[in-house]
Amino acid sequence: MTNERFAEEIIALTDTLYRVSYSILRDKYDREDAVQSCLEKAWKKRRTLRDERYLKTWLIRILINECYNVHRHKRELPQEIPEQAAPPGADPNLHDALMCLPEEVRTPIVLHYMEGYSIHEIALALRIAPGTVKSRMRNGRAKLKELLSEEEYS
């Protein structure tokens, strides 16, 4: 992949990177720093990408590591997903319900339903088994259903 094509590809994925960082980091500036660091590392390590088909997964993995680095440095727990993380036309309570999910369940749900990643891509990005991704998504969907139905009758 040429440098120009690589740059075009990562620029095209920048919005996705910001949305994924929303599911992990709380502070807007921390999210911006994590995405910036991700893009910088990706550029420096672009020659280590073995297969162009996995560029998106590779970038997400770098981003997740950067987000965890921010957590480690700030010792902060994720507590907020901005409204933009919810898909257009989504139930307004979805944002609040997503906030109630633990990060390990929330991240695969955001990657799959809001960013369109496959189970396999999520498993590669999070470095977990595809079965674990499915299990976390199943548990997350059940919890979301429970939370959203509770709000409906409140």
Short names for language-model regions:
Residues 48-50, 61-80, 139:
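Arg/Lys-rich amphipathic alpha helix in sigma70-family domain 2
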Residues 108-112:
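A short pre-motif secondary-structure segment
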Residues 64, 68, 126-150:
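DNA-recognition helix of helix-turn-helix
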Residues 19, 33-40, 44, 53-65:
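Structural recognition of an alpha-helix C-terminal capping motif at a helix-to-coil junction
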Residues 14, 18, 39, 102, ...:
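C-terminal flanking helix
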Residues 69, 74-99, 118, 153-154:
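Internal acidic/polar
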